[in-house]
């Protein structure tokens, strides 16, 4: 048995192997400057991937350090010499093993075949070379060997024969294959003898070259198109750059479309605004012409109100088109219309203004229906001020409204106070019931009737209110016959408050109409 190599020989051997470009990166992850090796596959690994290989077991991968371990055998060195990252990559890809998971990859059929092949080639190299290392006398051969090795290996197994070279070249390269194998084994200075792996697959796959070339031409170009052994990264970067370029072009087109759509929308908006402005100018000129044609008082009123100068739309109302002077007429049937509405005012219909003391209908009588038909309980309504009609000339600016409202209230309160003085001029003392028209006798009469009927088993409304003839005669219905006095009082009070609120709301509507149409 030959002596084992010393530390110097081991360092020289691995220095030559690691100088090859394909061995400068980890076989599994591609990390730079790997310092560990898998003797089973003849590949170089980084420290992380070496730990993964250790976890697989020595029956699948035997790991050693190229820098720390000094007990290498000649068989192990020959396995590293005939192997290499490039040969392992080509073999795994050729047999369709592209998995990244270590368990899947090194338990596959391709890994088993490659382990057996490395063992056979290492044994043959050890038998031929023994303990000889590379010498400087044959250092000129490796310069030609890598080019021939890479070009022959990749082109022969990944592309059809018609693409690689003429038929004469293939026949020429096929014949010296055994001599290349023998020469590679005889001279270990040639580096990791790639021809040993390159020739045997060629001989076995030569009859099926065209079939393999037709099935996997594109995949072989993408995966092994580079000459440095890391073709996958190069091809993926090209594909990513192409996708990025297409994405940039699509983004530019989308931005251009958005800009064009926005520009068209702005142009259409500007055109519509110009058209509307032209229409407004035409309407303004028409209104100015109408204003110039007016005479005297009509023109002064139009200028004072500022109406008719500008028309908002084609259907807007203009005062200048049909301006007429409205003369206020004195209403003749004020009393009759008031008497017709007494019934509705009494039950809570909406009054024309806020509630006043003279509108309080809480005076009690024998029958509310009979009292509503008389004028004695509503004597104060005769002196009520006639409400003026609302016209365009009677509308005043906003600044004068508070003063006008106060004037109306002071005027009504003055009328009430003067009427009360005339009514109670000779009285020494008056009460609130007398002032507001409440009669105490009626209340006393109602209480006396209740006392009389306290012992009876059943009473009717006619017995309670003393309206026997009315119950059986005319058949008229009044609130006094339906609801008690207290409920009627509460009901009327609520209706009066609602009527007051509605009057205020109506006044606000008129003021808003004045504000809106008074600015034109």
Curated annotation (Swiss-Prot):
Enumerate the spans annotated as Arf-GAP domain.
11-127
Indicate, by first and last residue, each region the UniProt record lists as having compositional bias (Low complexity): 220-232
Q: Which InterPro entries match?
A: ARFGAP/RecO, ArfGAP_dom, ArfGAP_dom_sf
Segments forming C4-type zinc fingers: 26-49
Region entry Disordered: which residue ranges?
Answer: 159-240
Modification type Phosphoserine: residues = 145, 200, 236, 239, 311, 333, 339, 363, 367, 431-432, 512
- Return the Polar residues bias intervals: 170-185
Keyword tags: Acetylation, Coiled coil, Cytoplasm, ER-Golgi transport, Golgi apparatus, GTPase activation, Membrane, Metal-binding, Phosphoprotein, Protein transport, Transport, Zinc, Zinc-finger
Segments of this protein annotated with the region Required for interaction with coatomer: 97-520
Q: What molecular functions are annotated in GO for this chain?
A: GTPase activator activity; zinc ion binding
Q: How does it sit in the membrane?
A: Peripheral membrane protein
Q: What cellular component terms from Gene Ontology apply here?
A: Golgi membrane
PROSITE patterns given in the database record? ARFGAP
GO BP annotation list: COPI coating of Golgi vesicle; protein transport
Where N-acetylalanine occurs along the chain?
Answer: 2
Any coiled-coil regions, as ranges: 242-307
Where is it localised?
A: Cytoplasm; Golgi apparatus membrane
Q: Briefly, what is this protein's role?
A: GTPase-activating protein (GAP) for ADP ribosylation factor 1 (ARF1). Implicated in coatomer-mediated protein transport between the Golgi complex and the endoplasmic reticulum. Hydrolysis of ARF1-bound GTP may lead to dissociation of coatomer from Golgi-derived membranes to allow fusion with target membranes.
Q: How does it assemble?
A: Interacts with the coatomer complex. Interacts with C-terminal appendage domain of COPG1.
- Check the record and name the PANTHER family matching this protein: ADP-RIBOSYLATION FACTOR GTPASE ACTIVATING PROTEIN 3, ISOFORM H-RELATED (PTHR45686), ADP-RIBOSYLATION FACTOR GTPASE-ACTIVATING PROTEIN 2 (PTHR45686:SF10)
- Name this polypeptide is given: ADP-ribosylation factor GTPase-activating protein 2
């Amino acid at each position: 048995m030959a002596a084992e190599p010393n530390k110097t020989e081991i360092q020289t051997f691995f220095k030559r192997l690691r100088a090859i470009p394909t061995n400068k990166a980890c076989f599994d992850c591609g990390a730079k400057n790997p310092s560990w090796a898998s003797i089973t596959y003849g590949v170089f690994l980084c420290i992380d991937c070496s730990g993964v290989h250790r976890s697989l077991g020595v029956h699948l991968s035997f790991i050693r350090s190229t820098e720390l371990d000094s007990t290498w055998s000649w068989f192990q060195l020959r396995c590293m010499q005939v192997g290499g990252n490039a040969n392992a990559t080509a073999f795994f890809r050729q047999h369709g093993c592209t998995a990244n998971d270590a368990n899947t990859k090194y338990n596959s059929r391709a890994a088993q075949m490659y382990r057996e092949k490395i063992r056979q080639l290492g044994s043959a190299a050890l038998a031929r070379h023994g303990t000889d290392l590379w010498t400087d006398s044959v250092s000129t051969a490796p310069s030609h060997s890598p080019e021939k090795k890479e070009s022959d290996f990749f082109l022969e197994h990944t592309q059809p024969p018609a693409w690689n070279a003429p038929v004469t070249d293939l026949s020429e390269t096929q014949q010296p294959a055994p001599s290349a194998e023998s020469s590679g084994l005889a001279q270990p200075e040639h580096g990791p003898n790639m021809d040993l792996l390159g020739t045997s697959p060629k001989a076995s796959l030569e009859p099926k070259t065209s079939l393999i070339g037709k099935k996997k031409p594109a995949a072989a170009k993408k995966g092994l198109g580079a000459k440095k052994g890391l073709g996958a990264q190069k091809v993926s970067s090209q594909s990513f750059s192409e996708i990025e370029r297409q994405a940039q072009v699509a983004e530019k087109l989308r931005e251009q479309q958005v800009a064009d759509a926005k520009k068209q929308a702005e142009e259409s908006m500007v055109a519509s605004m110009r058209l509307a402005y032209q229409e407004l100018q035409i309407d303004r000129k028409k209104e100015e012409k109408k204003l110039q044609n007016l005479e005297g008082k009509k023109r002064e009123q139009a200028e004072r109100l500022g109406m008719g100068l500008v028309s908002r739309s084609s259907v807007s109302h203009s005062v200048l088109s049909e301006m007429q002077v409205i003369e206020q007429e004195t209403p003749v049937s004020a009393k009759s219309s008031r008497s017709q509405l007494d019934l509705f005012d009494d039950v809570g219909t909406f009054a024309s203004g806020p509630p006043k003391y003279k509108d309080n209908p809480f005076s009690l009588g024998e029958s509310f229906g009979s009292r509503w038909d008389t004028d004695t309980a509503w004597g104060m309504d005769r002196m009520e001020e006639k409400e003026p009609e609302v016209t365009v000339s009677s509308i005043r600016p906003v600044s004068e409204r508070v003063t006008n409202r106060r004037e109306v209230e002071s005027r009504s309160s003055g009328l009430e106070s003067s009427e009360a003085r005339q009514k109670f001029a000779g009285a020494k003392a008056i009460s609130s019931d007398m002032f507001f028209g409440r009669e105490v006798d009626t209340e006393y009469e109602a209480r006396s009737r209740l006392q009389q009927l306290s012992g009876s088993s059943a009473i009717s409304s006619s017995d309670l209110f003393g309206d026997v003839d009315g119950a059986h005669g005319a058949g008229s219905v009044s609130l006094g016959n339906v609801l008690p006095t207290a409920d009627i009082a509460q009901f009327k009070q609520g209706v009066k408050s609602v009527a007051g609120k509605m009057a205020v709301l109506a006044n606000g509507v008129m003021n808003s109409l004045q504000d809106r149409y008074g600015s034109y």
